């Protein structure tokens, strides 16, 4: 295996989900407006998917976030500042911590492999999180600099083309079944699912690990 591409958030760095949507929903509810939580959360997710799966013109994540908040504010006639609220909520992303084994494993793998990060994120977010945690790799690819999102094939093929690699020479490691397993698998990459919660299941991945140490102790041994 010549190269290993890692997803960033949920794979190398800790992440929480769902808080932003509920905060915006609360902002609306605080104006005395009744909001159906299930419907709101479903549409919150579908808006992101529609703007990342090639159904719309490319937008950086921050712009998607602002537009999504503004859409809900307009619908419910809330006089909120979508850009300000988006930046407030996104500020937490800059503080994400690396998993305990991340730096050690990456440093070890870089001795014998090309190590890249391939993440659905904006450049400034990933750059700051990497700097905060002292993480370095050979190259970093984001949805912002590739102008597309996982799991679209263009995301992965651009990385291959940029490095003169064939799909069978690359291992993709990540926690998302759709983005990090089905996406790269579709173009012929080997895949490793990081199942930190031990939930189990087989979705076409070649390997399953519970933390990054499993790459050194098992997958690449």
Regions found by a protein language model. Give the residues of each.
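Asp-based, Mg2+/Mn2+-dependent phosphohydrolase catalytic module
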Residues: 1-4, 14, 80, 103, ...
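Structured helix-beta-strand junction loops
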Residues: 111-112
């Amino acid at each position: 295996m010549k190269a290993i591409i890692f997803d960033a958030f949920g794979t190398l760095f800790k992440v929480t989900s769902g808080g932003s949507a509920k905060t915006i929903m609360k902002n609306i509810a605080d104006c005395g407006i009744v909001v159906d939580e299930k419907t709101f959360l479903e549409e919150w997710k579908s808006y992101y998917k529609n703007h990342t799966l090639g159904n719309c013109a490319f937008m950086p994540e921050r712009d998607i976030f602002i537009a999504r908040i503004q859409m809900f504010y307009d619908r419910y006639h809330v006089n909120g500042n979508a850009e300000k609220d988006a930046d407030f909520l996104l500020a937490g992303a800059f503080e994400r911590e690396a998993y305990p084994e991340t730096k050690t494993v990456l440093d070890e793998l870089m001795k014998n492999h090309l190590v890249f990060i391939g993440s659905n994120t904006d450049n400034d977010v990933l750059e700051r999180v990497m700097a905060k945690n002292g993480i370095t790799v050979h190259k970093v690819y984001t949805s912002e600099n590739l102008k597309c999102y996982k799991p679209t094939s263009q995301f992965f093929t651009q990385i291959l083309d940029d490095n003169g690699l064939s799909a069978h020479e690359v291992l993709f490691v990540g926690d998302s079944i759709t983005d990090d397993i089905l996406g790269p698998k579709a173009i012929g990459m080997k895949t490793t699912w990081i199942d930190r919660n031990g939930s189990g299941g087989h979705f076409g991945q070649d390997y399953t690990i519970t933390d990054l140490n499993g790459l050194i102790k098992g997958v690449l041994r």
